[in-house]
């Protein structure tokens, strides 16, 4: 079954219920949330996340397999500032608890940045952080994200992700989030040879670890190492390639999450594109006038 949705907001009093309602309004059957603002570590207690009402709404709308995204502020690749590393480990442990309470099985994590110390040192630090954060009997997996290679990011190649996975003691608790924009920006040819890229992923990491897909177009050419998302069909990856990924038979049961930009010039009146992009990916026909339609809706 095609599992297709987007990033949605979990905020206010409704929390999980509000997230599920937003996802349903887009025609989604899965979604991704941050448990609070992605740029900080302030979080509500689990009992204020309105989980019961949210799960009821999800069940009524045939939504499951939701995904949590850890905040950007976590950097367990930092070997320069011990306090940043410790904050990352401790916060990751508390995020695992929140993810479990929400009924999600995957928590997406940007592996970390080496902050100028070199990839090998960064990867070693990430391994240490994951070994400290993971508890062998937890039922939540950390889904390490494929990165674009911007700045000092680790995880820009399948080999780097495999190195992290191999170094972690309880690596059965690790999975991978495959981001189409990041992978394209890192230099992989998902436009002309997605099957070849997937085979390479399978050989180096193992396709059974691919548990989340982020479906994004890219504002940059392949290999740019930039990480700037574009709306579906309006970037350098293009609609046909992304439609192929979304409907790939080997990835049928993997939740596919859109993180494309809101549409509009004015920040106050920007509109979420997800209802339209999801419909377009389902029906298989690219609409070159889509952005105008969203703006005028």
UniProtKB/Swiss-Prot annotation:
Zn(2+) 2 binds at residues 145, 179, 214, 259. It catalyses: Endonucleolytic cleavage to 5'-phosphooligonucleotide end-products. Zn(2+) 1 binds at residues 69, 110, 145. Its cofactor is Zn(2+). It holds the Pfam family AP_endonuc_2. One of its GO terms (biological process) is base-excision repair. One of its GO terms (molecular function) is DNA binding. Binds 3 Zn(2+) ions. Its EC number is 3.1.21.2. Zn(2+) 3 binds at residues 182, 227, 229. The keyword rRNA-binding does not apply. InterPro entries: AP_endonuc_2, AP_endonuc_F2_Zn_BS, Xyl_isomerase-like_sf, Xyl_isomerase-like_TIM-brl. It is an enzyme of class 3 (hydrolase). Keywords: DNA damage, DNA repair, Endonuclease, Hydrolase, Metal-binding, Nuclease, Zinc. NCBIfam families: nfo, PRK01060.1-1. HAMAP family: Nfo. Belongs to the AP endonuclease 2 family. Endonuclease IV plays a role in DNA repair. It cleaves phosphodiester bonds at apurinic or apyrimidinic (AP) sites, generating a 3'-hydroxyl group and a 5'-terminal sugar phosphate. This is Probable endonuclease 4.
